[in-house]
Amino acid sequence: ANYVDLFIAKYKELAIDNSNKVMSLDLKVMEELEAKAPEITTGFVIPIQFGGFGDAKVDFYVVEDFSYQELAVLHAQETGHEVFVWTINTDEALQKYVDSPVNGIITDQVALAKAIEEEHKTNNSLMDRFLRTLNVSIAK
């Protein structure tokens, strides 16, 4: 048996809930996993991304902050893929991505991210969003 078959067998043996996501830097492994077990949500981790995402046979992409391009994210979403950004740990970066079209943020600062997300939900008027955008632009 190969790695993917062993993984699927262990995944099923452990009765892991299919709401969990599985990701790897190895696209071929993820595409094979997607083909053999489409019920498992698969993702491709891309440390450095230039241009679009292509048409990988996975459910989502994970890009590093440095490589984030909003247009590429929107295109990926149009083709049915989710996009997550990692590892976002500063207040400034969390502020930026909470208001972005990404499907999720990977962070070590979970409490801070939740607080920022809640604050953005509470203060979400057009003026609030404008001021946040202005603040992020000035901070750069």
Regions found by a protein language model. Give the residues of each.
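Short loop-to-alpha-helix "cap/lid" segments that border enzyme active sites
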Residues: 1-140
